[in-house]
Amino acid sequence: MATRPQSPRARRWGYGISALINLIVAWGVNIWPGWDAVPFLTSGMTQVLPLVNLSLLVGFLTNLAYLVADPPWFKALGNILTAGISIAVLVRTLRVFPFDFGDSASTWDPITRGILIFLIVASTLGLAVQVVQFGRLLIRGPGPIKD
């Protein structure tokens, strides 16, 4: 089933909404209600928060950049950057493990660790795909890629 390419207007709407979501999440995590309002997060979250904020900032800035120009090579480069930072956030979260599930820890700790490991693996695969995509775009030039 062939998909129709999105119009530039639709893509720009998506970039604008994504940038706005990054701002809203950053505000929610840092200002109100703040990460410490989440009952199962521990003070260890302060060790993860700088990378979370970096991820939100880079996501915001890349989406703003895509509003101006979104050629495939530029999108692939932005995706490489955001995926790399996301992996760093996930690895830091797994190492620090800023969660306290109280009486349910014996159930939720391994589930949460498993989800984090799955996300690290999936994000790493996604990063590899973006690196290959970027390389193909550099080799083949700006024309469409035919699989």
Whereabouts are the PLM-identified features?
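N-terminal signal-anchor transmembrane alpha-helix
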Residues: M1-L57
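C-terminal halves and exits of single transmembrane alpha-helices
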Residues: T82-S104, A128
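Membrane-interface helix termini and inter-helical loops of multi-pass transporters
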Residues: W35-T42, F99-W108
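Loop-to-transmembrane helix junctions at the membrane interface
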Residues: G59-R92
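Short, charged juxtamembrane terminal tails flanking transmembrane helices
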Residues: M1-T3, R136-D147
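Alpha-helical transmembrane segments of integral membrane proteins
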Residues: T46-L56, G78-I85, T112-S123
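Alpha-helical membrane-associated segments of multi-pass integral membrane proteins
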Residues: D103-R140
